[in-house]
């Protein structure tokens, strides 16, 4: 089936929750996450929530980049280029609705990030600051704490963490 998003919003990445009944879309230009219920029989998507990825007070240019869910299906994170942050949300286990945890500073232009398979760490690439930052994920609250910042070569643009 065809999925439409608001004109000009720029759907960038879609990710399924671990149960496969909710799909989340990061919109690059609107800086929102749109949550859709997935009808597993028909394959249709029905939007049920749109939530901003930016603080209300932020008025500068920013674009969404990446989106991931922890392996325990409790937390969703998305990256903001311009605001230079990772936004975190809790995922309601029953409804799939998102609730804001907070905004966590990153290097400049966090184009890509990923979460380790155990759901303990998030690693973000600062494409303009030329660095990787690792964060510990609080398993109870979803808050991110910086563990280490590592300089890289020019413009790191993808973070992939293999299974172990």
Regions found by a protein language model. Give the residues of each.
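Beta-rich, blade/repeat-based domains predominating
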Residues: 5-21, 53-73, 106-121, 152-164
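Blade-level signature of beta-propeller repeat domains, shared across WD40, Kelch, NHL, RCC1
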Residues: 127-136, 145-164
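Conserved beta-strand positions in repeat-built beta-propeller and related beta-rich domains
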Residues: 17, 25-28, 78-81, 124-127
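Structural signal for beta-propeller blades
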Residues: 31-33, 84-86, 131-132
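Beta-propeller fold detector
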Residues: 1-3, 44-53, 98-105, 144-152
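Oxyanion-binding "anion nests"
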Residues: 26-37, 45-76
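C-terminal structural cap/anchor segments
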Residues: 65, 69-109
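Short loop/turn segments immediately following beta-strands, especially the blade-tip
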Residues: 36-44, 89-96, 135-142
């Amino acid at each position: 089936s065809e999925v439409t998003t608001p004109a000009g919003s720029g759907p960038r990445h879609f990710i399924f929750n671990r149960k496969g009944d909710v799909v989340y879309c990061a919109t690059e230009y609107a800086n929102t996450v749109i949550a859709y219920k997935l009808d597993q029989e028909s394959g249709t998507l029905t939007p049920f929530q749109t939530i901003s990825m930016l603080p209300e007070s932020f008025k500068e240019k920013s674009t969404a980049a990446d989106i991931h869910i922890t392996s325990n299906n409790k937390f969703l994170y998305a990256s903001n280029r311009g605001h230079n942050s990772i936004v975190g949300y809790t995922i309601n286990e029953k409804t799939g609705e998102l609730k804001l945890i907070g905004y966590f500073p990153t290097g400049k232009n966090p184009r890509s990030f990923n979460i380790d398979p155990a759901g303990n760490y998030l690693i973000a690439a600062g494409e303009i600051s030329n660095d990787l930052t690792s964060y510990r994920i609080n398993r109870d609250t979803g808050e991110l704490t910086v563990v280490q910042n590592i300089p890289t070569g020019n413009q790191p643009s993808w973070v992939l963490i293999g299974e172990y």
